[in-house]
Amino acid sequence: MSVLLGLVVGALTVQFLRLGAADMLAAPALQRENYRGHRLPTAGGVLIVLAVLVVEAGRAVLGSLGVGHDPGLTLARSEVLFAVFGFGLLGLVDDLLGDGSSRGFRGHLRALADGRITTGFLKLFGGAGVAVVLVATPGFATGRRLLVDAVLIALAANLGNLLDRAPGRTIKAAAIAYVPLALLLGTGAVGIAIAPAMGAAFGLLGDDLHERLMLGDAGANVIGAVLGLGVVLGRGEATRITALVVLIVLNVAAELVSFSAVIDRVPWLRAIDRFGQLPERRGA
């Protein structure tokens, strides 16, 4: 499977699943109010998780039948599967059980100091654990590299969530980040491994923009984690350190300022952010 084919298959699969899961997404337990007070399904990003599973299962079946030249489940594809399921599960728990009363690192730490463990804290703690497991596999260095790579993946996942404050924002940011990453990864094993997940994310852009569903943490965290994993698996130390610094800056900035306020003050960022959104939002 090529990178382009992986993107296309991921996008088509997630749309097929969205149509088939319409009744499930309409369940009262999944309905939440968005920033405009509209009620729509949250945790729509779980469709990305399911799409990756369907694509990988399909590749396995076709490979067993001798169709194509699939080498089997590579290490990179195994890592993507674990990342998607791990971060997807943690995000889903927060989507379904979180009350939104505590936000950001400081909010979760304040709640912990008060003797409360929030679902957001569980997601952050669990996400760090998933990231460590991802990089603590044969072929990875130990010590400093393990720490750098685990923090990079965890912060990338968290940034995906931090950006998910307006329709399409996380997916647009992911597309902007994915283009240079895809060029750097080329047609190698890592580029092919992350393509179905990214294709599935891009396949939900229209639904996110038109407010047919919300990605939720189950989707936003997964998108960020897959991009972070792509950097970790496919690039050298200089690229990883650069990405880590950028992620640290953005995660810290999110604790100090509102990304939405910054975007609204910068014309070109505002234009990108609102492109494709419903007219009511564009005129806001």
Question: Model-predicted segments: where are they?
Answer:
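"…together with the soluble PPM/PP2C metallo-phosphatase catalytic core" -> "…together
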Residues: M1-M214, A218-V257, A261
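Short, highly charged, low-complexity non-transmembrane loops/tails of multi-pass membrane proteins
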Residues: A261-A284
